[in-house]
Amino acid sequence: HVMSKESIEDVVRKSLEKYFKDLGEQLPSNVYDMVVLTVEKPIFEAVMARADGNQSQAAEILGINRNTLRKKLQQHGLL
């Protein structure tokens, strides 16, 4: 099953709509950081698995430099 950009967008949108609904009248805060941190970890997990743990290859797949990748892996407890 190939996941399209649109289906990823739909998942994020629906998840946020549910999150806002669950909050009720409470005003959400730091939504951007919450979403980025939540989405980043599985991206790095999947890409590192695809690259068989090779950080240089994973960085190339992601289009980021290896130092940035290492920083993000550490941030998410993946190193």
Task: Label each PLM-derived region with a short phrase.
Residues 2-7, 14-79:
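Bacterial C-terminal helix-turn-helix
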